[in-house]
A protein has these predicted regions:
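Active-site neighborhoods and metal-handling regions in enzymes and metal-associated proteins
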Residues: 1-298
Length: 298
C-alpha cells in the first residue's frame, strides 16, 4: 500500500529532532522556513506548493496548492491555506531579523517573493537538515528494506526474462521500471541536488555503457536524445554477445535503494574475451564484499 500516510508519531519525532538540532547549532534561533518539497515531505508527509514555518514552540504548514490534498494525506498537526506569503505574517507577526532556510534549495526568486512580505536575512541550515536525514528511524529503515526487497525481486529475478534479441535499451528500461511501478514502486528517484530527479534509470548495451554523462555516476548512457541522457537509446538494440548495464533505482514511500547490475546476453564461452569478463566479474564481487566489510555505524 504505497499511499499510507507517514505516521503522526514519526512526523512529531522528526520535528522534535529538528528543534533540538537547531538549538544545538544556535541556542538563540527563533524561526526557520522550508519551501522545497523534499524537506516538506520529510517533516509533514506531503509535497505541496507552500512553506513550512517552525519556531521553538510552534510549527505551521502553509499551503497554496493543494490545501485539500495536504489535509487528506498528511498527519501534520497544523496545516493552513495560504493565498500569498503575506499569510505567514498574519500567523507569525513578529518575523525575526534572521530566518534559517535550506540555502541549497531556495532560489533567489523565491527569497525575493518571501522578502516582499517577510523582511528577513536568510541563514543556511543545510548541515542540520542533512544530518537529521542521515540518521534513519525504524520507519525509514522499514521503507528502505521494502524498497530493497522489491528492487532485488525485479532487477535480479525478473529482468533476465526481459532480455531478448532486438529489444532496445529504452524499451528494456521502461519494461523493468513498469514492473517496479506495478508492484508499488514510486517510479522516480531523487537525489540531494537541485532539480535532481530520475524518472526511470538507464539501460546501456556494450559500448554505450562507457559513454560518459554529466551525472556523478560511473554508469554510461547515450540517453533517448542529446536532451535526455537517461533511460537509453530507442535505436540501439540487443544482440548476442552484448553486455547489458542496468542502473535502475527503486523507491518506496519516498525512500530509495540504488543498484547497478550487468548481464551478458548469449553464451559467454563463445566470447573471445570470456576469461577477461569472468575475471572482471570476480574482481567486482571481491571489491563489493571488501567494501561491505568496512561498513560500520558512525
Amino acid at each position: 500500500m504505497p499511499h499510507i500516510p507517514v505516521p503522526a508519531a514519526e512526523l512529531n519525532t522528526r520535528l522534535d529532532r529538528l528543534r533540538c538540532a537547531m538549538t544545538e547549532k544556535d541556542p538563540a534561533w527563533s524561526m526557520l522556513l522550508l519551501d522545497n518539497t523534499l524537506d516538506m515531505y520529510y517533516f509533514t508527509g506531503t509535497m505541496q506548493d507552500g512553506a513550512l514555518v517552525v519556531t521553538p514552540d510552534q510549527a505551521t504548514l502553509f499551503v497554496r496548492r493543494s490545501f485539500d490534498v495536504a489535509k487528506d494525506e498528511s498527519a501534520f498537526a497544523d496545516i493552513r491555506p495560504m493565498g500569498s506569503f503575506r499569510g505567514i505574517k498574519e500567523v507569525y507577526p513578529d518575523i525575526p531579523e534572521t530566518v534559517y532556510v535550506a540555502a541549497k534549495a531556495m532560489t533567489l526568486q523565491k527569497l525575493s517573493m518571501l522578502n516582499k512580505h517577510l523582511p528577513f536575512a536568510p541563514k543556511p541550515m543545510d548541515g542540520v537538515l542533512s544530518g537529521l536525514r542521515s540518521v534513519k528511524s525504524a520507519y525509514e529503515l522499514d521503507c528502505m528494506r521494502e524498497s530493497g526487497r522489491l528492487h532485488r525481486y525485479v532487477i535480479e529475478g525478473l529482468a533476465p526474462a526481459f532480455l531478448r534479441e532486438g529489444v532496445s535499451e529504452a524499451r528494456l528500461c521502461s519494461e523493468i521500471c513498469t514492473a517496479i511501478v506495478d508492484r508499488g514502486g514510486m517510479g522516480i528517484s531523487r537525489y540531494n541536488q537541485p532539480a535532481a530527479e530520475d524518472v526511470l534509470g538507464i539501460a546501456s548495451f556494450s559500448e554505450n555503457s562507457l559513454r560518459p554523462t554529466a551525472l556523478d555516476s560511473p554508469s554510461g548512457c547515450v540517453g533517448t536524445s542529446t536532451a535526455m541522457k537517461s533511460i537509453g537509446s530507442s535505436e540501439r538494440t540487443l544482440h548476442e554477445g552484448d553486455t547489458i548495464l542496468l542502473d535502475i533505482p527503486c523507491g518506496w514511500r519516498g525512500y530509495h535503494t540504488d543498484k547497478s547490475i550487468t548481464f551478458y546476453y548469449g553464451e559467454l564461452d563463445k566470447h573471445p574475451q570470456s576469461g577477461v569478463i569472468r575475471a572482471a566479474r570476480e574482481q567486482c564481487i571481491t571489491l563489493e564484499n571488501e567494501t561491505a566489510s568496512l561498513l560500520r555505524a558512525g
